[in-house]
Amino acid sequence: MKILFTIVVSALLLSTNICLGKDLIIAGADWCPACVKLKNFVKTNPKELENFDVQIIDIDKNPEIKKNLQIRLLPTSVIFNNDNKIQAKLEGYTQQNFINWLNKNK
C-alpha cells in the first residue's frame, strides 16, 4: 500500500495519478471529525488497504476535486477500475462500513 497526502492537485494531476495506479482516492478535510478518523485508520491499518494505492486529498486545499468527483459528503472515498472509471464510491465513514466496502471492491 502506498499512501500519498496531496496538498495541491489539479484535474490533470488527478488523471495522471489514476493512470499510474493511484486507485483509491479519499477526499476529506482537517475540520471533519469523520475524515480525521478515516485518515488515522488508513495510517494505522496498512493490511486492510494492501490491495490499494491510497491518495488522501484535502478538499479545502483542492476545491476542484469536489466538482471532479461530485463530492456531496465528507469523507468521500472513490475506487477507480483499470479503465480509470469510478468503480465504487463511499460517502461518510464508519470503520466497519469502510472495511466491508474495501473488501467488496478489491
Where in this protein do the model-derived segments appear?
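Bacterial N-terminal signal peptides
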Residues: 6-15
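Thiol-based oxidoreductase modules, predominantly thioredoxin-like and allied folds used
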Residues: 26-27, 51-63
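Extracytoplasmic/secreted envelope proteins and their assembly/folding machinery
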Residues: 39-42, 63-66, 95, 99-102
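Structural micro-motif
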Residues: 69-78
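Non-catalytic, surface beta->alpha helical segment in thiol-disulfide oxidoreductase systems
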Residues: 81-106
